[in-house]
From Swiss-Prot:
GO molecular function: ATP binding
Keywords from the UniProt entry: ATP-binding, Nucleotide-binding
Gene3D superfamilies: P-loop containing nucleotide triphosphate hydrolases
Lipid metabolism in keyword set: no
Residues of the signal peptide: none
Entry's family note: Belongs to the UPF0200 family.
Pfam families to which the protein is assigned, alphabetical: AAA_18 (PF13238)
Domain of life: Archaea
Keyword Nucleotide-binding: yes
Protein species of origin: Sulfurisphaera tokodaii (strain DSM 16993 / JCM 10545 / NBRC 100140 / 7) (Sulfolobus tokodaii)
Residues that coordinate or bind ATP: 11-18
Name under which the protein is recorded: UPF0200 protein STK_09500
InterPro entries, per database record: NTP_hydrolase-rel (IPR022970), P-loop_NTPase (IPR027417)
Amino acid sequence: MSLIKIIAITGMPGSGKGELAKLLREKGIKVITMSDVLREKYYKEAKEGERLMDFAKRIRELYGKGAVAKLCIEKIGKEEIVAFDGVRNWEEIEEFKKIGNVTIIAVHSPPKLRYERLLKRGRKDDTLTVEGLMKRDWEELEMGIGNVIALADYILINDSTIEEFKSKAEELLKRIL
């Protein structure tokens, strides 16, 4: 497999990673949402009553911290450019570097705004209390997401309207695609 162009999207829950992924899809770029790939495995292999976050930790303990990235790589196909939405740790970046040239984009939003978004989003595995959301943030940070955000090539600030975020994202994508 020759080297491909990889866009690694990272950010805390509710930061706007999905909105950036949507823009990339609109440009015809294949986006693989890492949590969807993980959920696929979770529904097949999770223990009775096991939370998705606990399943993710267990998978990484069994197969290494880059385990979810390896599962995602299998879904690339023949694409020359692909985006991975939801990179959680540096080991995943290292897996992606084995097959492509990686550009990391971190999406950042203030916690209060992210919590509001997550409460509105209502995804099945989203917790519905501020305390639960704060706990999830710490679990993400323990997984290593802070290192990926800190070492990102670009940081998109998402603290205003969706229109303003899309405009900033479009400008960035023009430069890197």
